[in-house]
Amino acid sequence: IILQNKSFMSLVYALYLTEQFFTKPDRDIIERYLVPSYFENDFSALDDGLYIQKEIWGREGRNIQVVQKRGNQAELYMEKFVDNYDDIVCRDSKKVMYQDFIKQKHFTHTVDSGTKEGCLTLSCFMLGDQASAVGCRFSPEEIAGTEAYFVPLLVD
């Protein structure tokens, strides 16, 4: 349940920034693969720019916003609207976290209804300290939600 809480990414990133908790090889991995992530209380100290705002217990793109930070204010830049909002099983979230907004590359992918352009999201699943699986979702939208397709991967 800890890993389902998105603020876990903020914790890992905050510990990474201290340069005291993780080894150098661990920090290199975090720097390469973890999008800079921040606790809600740290938002005012961040540089102006675009950030993703996520509820810490959010799922399937529910309640995700892209916000433009200017000073201590956050203006809505883009919002994710999901189909069947009330059918998405997730805990109620009163807290949010932030991540740097990274513009994604677009890909063309063939799905059951034809060819679509969209974005890929890669995920790694862990069992203990071992990577156990890799997953990929394709979405015609930049923020993947319930419309995303699971994409088979081949390791050759």
Task: Identify the meaning behind each predicted range.
Residues 38-52, 57-60, 66-156:
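Phosphate-binding site of ATP-dependent enzymes
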